[in-house]
Design a protein with these regions (language model features):
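Extended, highly charged
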Residues: 1-246, 251-261, 265-423
Length: 423
């Protein structure tokens, strides 16, 4: 499948729109529906799409219900598959190639006025070094025609880059914009060990579409999804430059940092290409970051009790807070679930545990469970001096934070009839 195959329900905007704040302003004014902008003033011949990957639209796009989502991702993590390789002549992404790289000619947007400039936020980076392949999300500030500055969080790609720099090497990369959503989901997952995320994407592609995931090889040897709208390739250089400010998932401005510079040698795209122009801090951003955390949290909690579902909350920006539904079989299941959930997603700051009768996607019902089933002095865990998230502006100067868990389940030995809602 291809990214564009999932845009059938999009509203097409034919009026001239600027990539400098224009897409963001239009989307905000219309309550962020699924949109395709086909008349971008600065980049004629190129379109842009926003707001595809909300939770509901994503599940509809890949043909599953929200209730099936977590278990489907967990299945793919346990059953990785091997993509198939196709010749570049059969790869849609190679339908057009720029004579010389000009990233300024494609619709990389400047959404928020507070951002440093034009940012590619929905593109994934595929990198390979010393026999290890990694695919992950990292925002990129467009510095000039063939350079971006990438925010590398301290995970596998940053480790790969640091190792290469220590050895006097560079890291070959490919940047992929608008592949099929299953590729984006796999890229958004985080693993403790080095796992080839493209094998997770291949498993999802086979399970959901009954077709193998097709890759094609670039001139620098890297393999990328053949149906992607845009692909550009190059390397992580030894140079650093300023990156940020940037409106992040919390809706607050992230810091200015010295970050690695990417240099690009080639750029290809499909006929009539559609750039995925994710708006930072909105629902699509929170979906891509938060939903892939749910199966890791569920897996961690399932090791200590029966976990039924996990929801990354909107108020927690899809990243810093979750509600976990369990089926309680022992008196301490709620407390164990808190500890396991926080361990399963180390950036999370707050977790609430509820019983199986609570709709965890409804904040009113979760709050109802809190006020009717939770006693603050005995059902609360506070953990101090924990590793914090760089996305949390309240973290301490050394990067640590405290974390909290609420056990809003009915006491195990209580008469449950008095706790059940009749509404």
């Amino acid at each position: 499948m291809a990214f564009r195959d999932h845009l059938g329900a999009a509203e097409t905007i034919s009026q001239p729109i600027s990539l400098i704040h224009g897409m963001w302003e239009y989307s905000k004014a219309s309550q962020h529906p699924l949109l395709v902008f086909e008349n971008i003033v600065e980049t004629p011949g190129h379109k842009a799409a926003v707001n595809l990957l909300t939770r509901e639209r994503l599940c509809a796009a890949i043909g599953i219900t929200p209730e099936e989502y977590i278990d489907t991702l967990a299945w793919a993590m346990e059953n990785p598959s091997v993509p198939v390789l196709v010749d570049s002549n059969d790869a849609e992404c190679f339908q057009n190639q720029q004579d010389s790289v000009d990233l300024e000619a494609i619709p990389i947007p400047h959404h928020w006025p507070q951002d440093r400039g034009r940012y590619s936020s929905a593109s994934v980076i595929i990198a390979q070094y010393d026999g290890i392949r990694n695919m992950s999300f990292h925002r990129q500030f467009l510095r000039d025609k063939n350079h971006t500055v990438v925010r590398l969080v301290p995970r596998h790609l940053r480790t790969m880059m640091s190792t290469a720099r220590a050895n006097g090497d560079t890291v070959d990369i490919a940047v992929v914009n608008a592949p099929d959503p299953v590729v984006l989901l796999a890229a958004a997952m985080s693993f403790d060990e080095n796992i080839d995320e493209l094998t997770i994407a291949a498993a999802l592609h086979e399970k959901l579409y009954n077709q193998p995931l097709r890759l094609t090889k670039l001139p620098n040897g890297l393999e990328v999804p053949a149906s992607a709208e845009y692909v550009f390739w190059g390397k992580i250089t030894a140079e650093n430059d300023d990156e940020g400010p940037y409106v992040d998932i919390t809706g607050t401005l992230d810091d200015v940092r010295q970050e690695p510079v990417l240099e690009f040698d080639g750029l290809v795209h499909r006929d009539n290409p559609i750039f995925h122009a994710l708006i930072p801090g909105e629902a699509e951003h929170k979906t891509l970051m938060g939903l892939p955390r749910s199966p890791t949290i569920k897996d961690a909690v399932s090791k200590v009790c029966e976990c039924l579902d996990v929801h990354m909350t909107e108020g927690g920006c899809g990243w810093l807070a979750a509600v976990v539904k369990i089926r309680k079989k022992h008196h301490d299941d709620g407390i164990k679930a808190i500890e396991a959930a926080l361990a399963g997603h180390r950036s999370m700051k707050m977790v609430t545990i509820v019983d199986e009768d609570i709709d965890i996607a409804d904040p009113v019902r979760v709050e109802w469970a809190m006020v009717t089933r939770w006693q603050p002095d005995k059902d609360t865990i506070i953990l101090s001096n924990q590793k914090g998230s760089s996305l949390d502006p309240s973290r301490y100067p050394d990067g640590t934070t405290s974390k909290v868990g609420f056990d809003a389940t009915i006491s195990f030995d209580a008469d449950k009839s008095g706790f059940m809602s009749v509404q």
